[in-house]
Regions:
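Short, positively charged low-complexity motifs
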Residues: 1-12
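Fold-independent oxyanion-binding glycine-rich loops
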Residues: 25, 162, 195
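A general structural motif
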Residues: 170-175, 236
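Short acidic, Gly/Ser-rich segments with clustered Asp/Glu that frequently serve as metal-coordination loops
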Residues: 199, 222-224
Length: 272
């Protein structure tokens, strides 16, 4: 039996028939492990070797998921090492075109829905323009990768709103202003998530109404950073569903449970 690990959270679509998936990696499956390197070892040859390995690993993951009836999967941002950094000057989109074509065919054939989640430093509401510019470059990388793998806009990039910087309302306004300036190819894939510290479900729903962006509901984040306390989770999901249009596909949610032995927000290794 293969144990699924990653961010130890389930990724769900809600509808007449629920689909379930997971984030990033498999345990006990050596041919699915991603590889990377440190910056000083990131020669062009080494990066090409790593990208080739990682794309093969992704193909193996997709095959495994299909065999297990798993229809959703979050792809690791590290699949292209230093993908949004000038350290990586490899023209990987062209060099690996045939591999991406094969992966796209797999995703279509398996009826798989994939996603990505740019990291904690991808912050478009920062008051620092350099931070915002780096975030935009990172979003461009994630979007380019998804565009090579998936044609339609149902395959999403999940983003947190970002920091508060001493004035939450102004930070929310900056997020909306920066979002409006993003390229349409990025906006068609972006969805925002309630986080466990700063931005509640109520906050992201307010933003979603203003800029017409889908919301993904994270149940554990909602428990740690609650809002709309007069509503149960089913009622919260009904509000979230209203942010999704047909072009976005079926509504998604993130489901995980607290590890009782670790800090608040640490995911349990399984879901009951």
């Amino acid at each position: 039996m293969t144990r699924i690990v990653g961010h130890t959270r389930a990724i769900l679509t809600i509808g007449d028939k629920m689909k379930i998936g997971y984030a990033c990696t498999l345990a006990l499956q050596d041919d699915t492990k991603m590889r990377s390197c440190i910056a000083k070892n990131a020669s062009e040859l080494r990066l090409i070797e790593l990208i080739d390995h990682n794309l093969t690993a992704l193909s193996n993951i997709l095959t495994y998921n299909h065999q297990q009836g798993i229809k959703m999967f979050r792809i690791s941002s590290d699949i292209i090492p230093f993908g949004s950094s000038p350290i990586n000057s490899v023209d990987w989109q062209t060099l690996f075109q045939s591999a991406f074509t094969f992966l796209q065919e797999q995703i279509k054939r398996y009826d798989m829905r994939v996603s990505m989640h740019p990291g904690q430093y991808t912050i478009i509401n920062s008051p620092n323009p350099e931070v915002v510019q780096r975030a935009i470059v990172d979003l461009q990388y994630h979007c380019a990768l998804l565009d090579l793998l998936c044609e339609d806009a149902t395959h999403k990039m999940v983003l947190h709103v970002g920091g508060v910087y001493g004035d939450k309302q102004e930070a929310m306004k900056r997020f909306m202003a920066e979002y409006r300036e993003l390229d349409e190819t990025i906006k068609r894939r972006l969805i925002i998530e309630n986080d466990d510290r700063y931005y509640t479900l109520e906050d992201v729903l307010w933003i979603a109404e203003k800029i017409q962006i889908p919301v993904v509901f994270d149940n554990l984040h909602h428990k740690l950073n609650p809002s709309l306390t007069n509503l149960n989770e089913k009622q919260c999901l009904a509000l979230v569903k209203q942010t999704w249009k047909s072009v976005d596909g079926r509504m998604k949610m993130h489901y995980s449970e607290q590890d009782p032995l670790k800090r608040a927000g640490a995911h349990a290794s399984s879901i009951e």
